[in-house]
Design a protein with these regions (language model features):
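Active-site and adjacent substrate-binding regions of carbohydrate-active enzymes
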Residues: 1-184
Length: 184
C-alpha cells in the first residue's frame, strides 16, 4: 500500500523483457554468443495482480516489438506507449505509422517525448527539413514560429484518442536540448 502513497502510476520499463529477453553468457565480452530466452509472460502479471492488486500501470512497449510482445501488452490490459516525436521519422512516413496520433488506440498513453528523448524544440531543430515539413503538414500549421511550435505538438498529443497524455515540463516550457533529462 505504501507504494501507492508515492506514485499514482507505475510504468514498467522494457516491457518486452517479460515476453523475451536477450541472454549473454557470463564473461562474454560481446553479445555474439547471446540468445533469446522466454520471459515470465502474463503469468507474472496475473500473480502480482492477485497478490498486490494493480493501481495504474503503463507498459513501455517501445523499440523492437514483436507480435508476441504486442499480444502480451493486449493480454495484460495495460496501455502501451506512443511517443509523438517518433511519428515524423521519414523512414516510416506512411499514414499507417503507429506513432501518428490518428492511429493511437484509446488504451494507450501518449508522451511528447520521454526522459531519453530530446525536448520538443530540440528535436524539431534536429530533424531534417523534410521531416519538419511532414510534421507541419500533419499539424496543418505552416505559420507558427519554430520556437512556439511545441505548443502545437502538445495540443496534438492532447487531442489524440490516447486515454492519458504525459508532457515533460521541458516541453511545456519550450526549452531546448540543454534542458533534456537524459542522453542515453
Amino acid at each position: 500500500w505504501y507504494v501507492y502513497q508515492l506514485y499514482d502510476v507505475t510504468r514498467i520499463d522494457h516491457f518486452r523483457g517479460f515476453d523475451e529477453y536477450y541472454s549473454i553468457p557470463y564473461g562474454d565480452k560481446t553479445a555474439e554468443n547471446g540468445h533469446w530466452e522466454k520471459g515470465p509472460g502474463i503469468g507474472l502479471f496475473r500473480c502480482v495482480e492477485q497478490n498486490l492488486g494493480w493501481h495504474e500501470v503503463i507498459a513501455e512497449d517501445l523499440g523492437y516489438v514483436t507480435d508476441s510482445v504486442r499480444q502480451l501488452v493486449k493480454d495484460s490490459g495495460f496501455p502501451g506507449m506512443k511517443v509523438l516525436e517518433f511519428a515524423f521519422d521519414s523512414r516510416d512516413s506512411g499514414s499507417a505509422n503507429d506513432y501518428l496520433p490518428h492511429n493511437y488506440p484509446e488504451n494507450s498513453v501518449v508522451y511528447t517525448g520521454t526522459h531519453d528523448n530530446e525536448t520538443l524544440n530540440g528535436w524539431f531543430k534536429s530533424i531534417t527539413k523534410e521531416e519538419q515539413q511532414m510534421a507541419r503538414d500533419y499539424l496543418c500549421d505552416q505559420r507558427t514560429p519554430q520556437k512556439l511550435l511545441h505548443q502545437s505538438f502538445i495540443a496534438l498529443a492532447m487531442r489524440s484518442a490516447a486515454r492519458m497524455c504525459i508532457i515533460p515540463l521541458q516541453d511545456y516550457l519550450g526549452l531546448d536540448n540543454s534542458c533534456r533529462i537524459n542522453t542515453p
